[in-house]
């Protein structure tokens, strides 16, 4: 009897007013209504927006913590972009831990030390680290090196001629210009007679007859 009541509660029977045929219309999915269909899409959009806001804020907080020298929030380190060195190690495949070489510590200066400081702070260099001169070259090596050396060819230098360059450093005036022109004409054409021309003497004005 209880089972029958539960079945009647889940299966809703309604009779169509227009068609009095007594057919039972079952509605097994109560969430298939139009109002709930729009509501779940709106709820999904709100969920996605809240998730994006959470991820963005977490990445921003991790970036601020990294600038301050702190570790990122636990479980959210994958949100923080890798640094330049970290990405370089990942690209080159050198993820293994490389330890820096540390020489062996001894109470006295060994052959790997340059020296030591005493109690007064004075530095005492190690005699084993002094500069050793290279061995002298043998006569055969010295003669072979002298033969291999050759004197380089002398560089060709162009000698400027007087006709191309004028070394007269006087201020350019009319007299200097005329003298320079006359000198050039004498050098290039010696047969041409030089005529005397005085620039300062201006020609007399012609008289007009009345």
Swiss-Prot record:
Region named Disordered: 125-149, 175-210
Listed Polar residues bias regions: 175-199
Record field: transmembrane: 41-61
The keyword Metal-binding belongs to this UniProt entry's keyword annotation: no
Phosphothreonine: residues bearing it: 191
UniProt membrane topology term: Single-pass membrane protein
GO MF annotation terms: protein-macromolecule adaptor activity
Domain of life where this protein originates: Eukaryota
Pfam families in the cross-refs: RCR (PF12273)
Gene Ontology CC, one term: vesicle
Hydrolase in keyword set: no
Phosphoserine carried by residues: 161
Locations listed in the record: Membrane
Alphabetically ordered keywords of this record: Membrane, Phosphoprotein, Transmembrane, Transmembrane helix
GO biological process, one term: protein localization to vacuole
Main subcellular location: membrane
Miscellaneous comment as given in the Swiss-Prot or TrEMBL entry: Present with 1230 molecules/cell in log phase SD medium.
Record family assignment: To yeast YBR005W.
Protein name: Protein RCR2
Organism of origin: Saccharomyces cerevisiae (strain ATCC 204508 / S288c) (Baker's yeast)
């Amino acid at each position: 009897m209880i089972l029958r009541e539960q079945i009647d509660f889940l299966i809703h029977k309604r009779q169509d007013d227009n068609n009095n045929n007594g057919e039972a219309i079952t509605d097994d999915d109560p969430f298939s209504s139009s109002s709930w269909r729009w509501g779940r899409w709106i709820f999904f959009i709100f969920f996605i927006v809240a998730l994006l806001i959470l991820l963005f804020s977490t990445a921003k907080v991790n970036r601020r913590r990294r600038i301050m020298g702190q570790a990122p929030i636990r479980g959210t380190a994958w949100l923080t972009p890798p640094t330049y060195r970290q990405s370089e190690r990942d690209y080159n495949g050198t993820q293994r831990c490389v330890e820096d070489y540390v020489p062996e510590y001894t109470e006295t200066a060994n052959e790997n030390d340059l020296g030591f400081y005493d109690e007064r702070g004075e530095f005492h260099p190690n005699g084993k680290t002094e500069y050793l001169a290279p061995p002298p070259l043998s006569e055969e090596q010295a003669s072979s090196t002298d033969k291999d050396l050759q004197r380089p060819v002398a560089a060709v230098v162009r000698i400027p001629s007087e006709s191309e360059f004028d070394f007269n450093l006087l201020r350019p005036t009319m007299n200097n210009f005329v003298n320079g022109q006359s000198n050039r004409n004498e050098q290039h054409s010696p047969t041409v007679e030089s005529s005397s021309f005085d620039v300062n003497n201006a020609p007399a004005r012609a008289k007009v007859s009345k």
